[in-house]
Swiss-Prot record:
It comes from Bacteroides fragilis. Transmembrane segments: none annotated. One of its GO terms (molecular function) is metal ion binding. Mg(2+) binds at D73, D123. Its EC number is 2.7.7.-. It catalyses: GTP + ATP = 3',3'-cGAMP + 2 diphosphate. The lineage of its organism: Bacteria, Pseudomonadati, Bacteroidota, Bacteroidia, Bacteroidales. The active site is at D71, D73, D123. This is Cyclic GMP-AMP synthase. ATP 2 binds at N109. Its cofactor is Mg(2+). Coiled coil: none annotated. Binds 1 Mg(2+) ion per subunit. The keyword Heme does not apply.
Amino acid sequence: MANLDTQFQEFYGELQITVTKKQALITSHNNLRTKIQKYFAKNHPEYVPSFYIQGSYKMGTTIRTRDDECDLDDGCYFIPKPEVKGITLQNWVMDAVNGTVGATPVHKNKCIRVNYAAGYHIDLPVYRKERCNDNTEHPELAVRDGEYELSDPREIVQWFNSKKKDNPVLIRLVSYLKSWCDTVRGFMPPGLAMTILASKYQKKHEGRDDIALRDTLKSIRTALQANFSCVVPGTPYDDLFESYDSNRQEKFMSELNGFIEDADRAVNEKNKLKASKLWKKHLGNRFHLAPDENDAEMSKLDKLRDIGNKVLTGIATTAHNGYIHAAEGVKNVSHRNYGNE
């Protein structure tokens, strides 16, 4: 089995946001917070916004896409509840961020998205809540095409934090799966779905991220074959796959099967270059090709198997120094140790 753990560790590094972009992202999100606070202080002083970073950035699973883009979710909370419609609250936040230098705000259904020319975007979902320190009360998310709906992103973060505790490989597995979805795109599930599936069905293999990923993919497939669903572990506990029609479901499962087939071939391939090409096919161009060489451990195993076969067939010889399967030496006695009958 070609051990490509080194290539996987390098690949994980390639998926990380650069220091420069991370600094720009944080600076931009701080500037947006300031703009929103100033807007409400001037135009709606009865409402004071507070903020909470959520989503993949909070969980530590953000990746750079193949287009070198990334994002950050910054929840905008109003406590106590403003007695206005959800779209009104969204419109006010939209007004607050309009005119941001180097950026274009977009009013989406469940957030205000600020797209930056520098290659990242910041989502501003808007919430309201009656009491600040009441953990039994779930926030209400403003929806453009509706009113409000219960949504508690903190529960998702807390759930994932419990899964990743003393389990750093989980973050890497989530990143690999998100890169797979980013490579294929189209009908593939969102990053949150892959985060949930990896967390629920993770398989571990110490020191071998390639095997851990292969086995986790198989575990996910088994679960989805039994029940094609992905329930969010937080209020409102919705199923991310509920809207998938049979065509999209079949396409995703076909892609999953193809990935597993190639992952099996890669793990069992002794040539590192050939194995890395199989992984690269699904994980994208940032997965580095390995040297064109056979795995040392697999070569040793092949030699041992060869010696074993010659011992079993009675054609092995032993050299004067004790090495079996020498070019010259004393012919071995036929093997008769077949265990207890």
